[in-house]
Amino acid sequence: MENFRIAKFLMQERQGIMIMKFYGRETERKKLNSMFCTDGQMISLIYGRRRIGKSELIRQVLKETELKSIYYECKQTTEQNNVDSLSELVGETFDFPKPAFADMESLLRFLFRTSEKEPLILVLDEYPYLRENVKGLDSVLQSVIDEYRDRSNMKLIICGSYVDTMKELLAKQNPLYGRIDLTLNLKPMDYYESALFYPDFSDEDKVRIYSVFGGIPYYNRLIDGKKSVRENIIDLIASPGARLENEVSMYLSSEISKITNANEVFEALAKGFSRYKDILDQSHVSSGPALVDVLDKLIRMDVVDKITPINDENNRKKSGYFISDNLSLFYYKYIFRNSSRMNIMDSDIFYDRYIAEDFETKYVPKVFEDVCRQYLIRRNRKGLMDEIFEKIGKYYYDDPVAKKNGEFDIVTQDDKGIFSMKQNSAKNL
């Protein structure tokens, strides 16, 4: 019998209640399907920032397999409440009355024991919620995994959005260390996968949309193909009460305790300050160590990147920090500092006055550099470059005669040590 929740999802889809086409993630899907086809017990860890599409990926691969599966979304409630909820799914999956279990350990042992007879996929989505409410859950899992390792056919997927918490499961001191067979850290999609969500736009407009909404599937599903780029931006983020108006601040608040420092850092980065000293001066963060903590956290959250020049990778003075999440970049560049104005102005007038010109002449061309980099990486992976490169990045140079310095936006280096200059020349799209 198919898992009840997955079967219900498929039935709704056929009836037109829920039709969501799945895009991209080919590599991740192949790895998970390969795991399902592997004999014996397999444990997988899937993590990544919220809205990145973890649950959607899992649901998709569950639809693609014939194995019996249980998908459970852990709750922020007591252990017994979670046990009761998961027990209901167990009864539905195996077509018998809801079983009674004293605790999560006894339930897990039952499922692992059952998988001795036939393969079973168990998904524990939002695992950190369960971990908070089941004392020593990592140790419990470790004990069950070890006990049944040589005789179960369990395919366990542990999934979560709190990146730091999920990474703890991979640490040497964690009971689950060495027991994870497959780790998937889901990153934002690149331009080429993201553009699949809005196929009816021109290539130029696809770049414009990507420059705002980036590679987060949840955001891209909100794009209305019947509206213009401008209308989508206004409706989704650049107007009072817009669907994504508070998305960035809510995400940061859920991950960072001192949101004021994060706001200060983001504002400095959005203004173009990328060097550590400049960010410290502009952001008014209380101290150097405090700034380091904020930057490190933002990097772990996949919203900021630290970039060093390809020709001087160990020179800390030439390292730069940049906002890598497009929605965060757009928000802090145009919305955050102007939110009071936006709330009392006509949305079209606000867009024309504070967004339109800079967006076309500076913002989009800058993001286009990243699209070009992604293009080169894709061609390189497919072996289509004349010279297969091993590194790609920025190239900084000093001109002692002219007494100035500069940079090439995109540079590649092959195994011969030859640099290939790929400088972006787009000014307007």
Which stretches of residues belong to each language-model region?
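Sensor-1/coupling segment of RecA-like P-loop NTPase cores
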Residues: 47, 129-133, 137, 143-173
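Conserved NTP-binding/hydrolysis module of P-loop NTPases
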Residues: 66-70, 75-98
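Active-site beta-strand-loop-beta-strand hairpin of nuclease catalytic cores
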Residues: 412-421
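Accessory nucleic acid-recognition modules appended to NTPase machines
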Residues: 225, 230-410
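Conserved lysine of the Walker
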Residues: 54
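Interdomain motor-coupling "hinge/lid" segment immediately C-terminal to the ATP-binding subdomain
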Residues: 166-262, 266-270
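Short glycine-rich substrate-engagement loop in P-loop NTPases that contacts/grips substrate
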Residues: 87-115
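Hydrophobic positions on the alpha1 helix immediately C-terminal to the Walker A/P-loop
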Residues: 57
